[in-house]
């Protein structure tokens, strides 16, 4: 097993999909096996990939005061080193990691401590998505500083940028013979002007779903595997809305292979469509312990075999105290 190495090269391999649709509750461990796509593997040998995806992560010490006494390793110490044993770990960072203090008017602004990022990297986190409705909480200056701080910590940021092309551009990783693309899409805008523009910093795509689909297609054109991190839906909803299901299917039809959803702050069902897993909402990971519906969580685990077969399951997690998630059972 190899840890992710960023690279912009590509085999150019594309797959065609079989058909499989199933729903499972994400609060339970489940297994969903997709049919391998024709034509895999591509040029050169490929290994088995293990990818983990999570829901919302806050590294804001005003939201989680325990960080001031326990340190930022507290956020990850209950995961049993899970993210160090995989090939790629992606999380939704629900705040700008910045010292810029320029809060935009909103009910619940968040600001993460940039000093928390090295602990996330040491825990095995590789990619953080800023495609969410809090990345812009300190305006364009805070967002751009956050992206720089993330990179300085050895992490890769997706889902936001200095303009829309940068915000929607996928990060590319060369891992064990595979070219893996990861992109972030923000559908949960508050307000809408947080979205990036032609010459304006912000988050990716917004409510322009045609633009989001084009981002998926662009990533698929130069990658073997496409992972989409999307912030969408309605907070505290127990199930995805019909429009989300339709959008998820369209993203897979456009070339997405794995979809990790966030924003509702609680787990939602998992679907397998055309052999590709859709985690509609992974709930909270590093977050205050608020209600049973929001402190019961999961980490998505996706395994891609050398022949292209995709298996997926949810690993149960409980937020046992503010900012401290713990794996319920070690896999």
For the regions a protein language model found, what residue spans apply to each?
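Secretory targeting and sorting signals
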Residues: 6-8, 12-34
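Acidic, metal/ion-coordinating pockets
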Residues: 3, 29-331
């Amino acid at each position: 097993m190899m840890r992710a190495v960023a690279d912009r090269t590509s085999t150019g391999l594309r797959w065609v999909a079989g058909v499989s649709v199933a729903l499972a509750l994400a609060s339970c461990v489940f297994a969903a096996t997709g049919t391998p796509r024709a034509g895999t593997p591509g040029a050169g040998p490929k290994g088995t990939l293990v990818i983990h995806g999570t829901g919302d992560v806050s590294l804001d010490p005003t939201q989680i005061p325990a960080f001031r006494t326990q340190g930022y390793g507290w956020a990850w110490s209950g995961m049993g080193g899970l993210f160090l044993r995989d090939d790629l770990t992606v999380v939704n960072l629900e705040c700008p990691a910045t010292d810029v203090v320029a809060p935009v008017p909103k009910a619940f602004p968040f600001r993460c401590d940039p000093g928390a990022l090295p602990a996330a990297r040491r825990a095995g986190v590789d990619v953080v998505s800023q495609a969410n409705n809090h990345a812009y909480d300190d305006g364009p200056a805070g967002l751009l500083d956050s992206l720089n701080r993330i990179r300085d910590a050895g992490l890769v940021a997706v889902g936001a940028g200095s303009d829309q092309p940068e915000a929607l551009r996928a990060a590319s990783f060369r891992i064990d013979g595979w070219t893996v693309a990861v992109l972030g899409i923000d559908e949960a805008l508050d307000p809408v002007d947080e979205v990036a523009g032609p010459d304006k910093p912000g988050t990716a795509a917004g409510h322009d779903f045609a633009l989001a689909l084009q981002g998926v297609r662009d990533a698929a054109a130069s990658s073997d595997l496409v992972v989409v991190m999307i912030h969408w839906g309605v907070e505290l909803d127990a199930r995805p809305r019909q429009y989300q299901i339709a959008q998820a299917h369209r993203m897979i039809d456009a070339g997405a292979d794995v979809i990790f959803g966030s924003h509702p702050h609680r787990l939602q069902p998992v679907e397998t469509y055309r052999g590709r897993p859709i985690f509609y909402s992974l709930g909270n990971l590093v977050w205050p312990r608020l209600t049973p519906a929001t402190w019961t969580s999961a980490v998505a685990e996706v395994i891609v075999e050398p022949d292209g077969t995709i298996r997926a399951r949810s690993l149960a997690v409980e937020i046992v105290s503010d900012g401290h998630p713990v794996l319920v059972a070690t896999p």
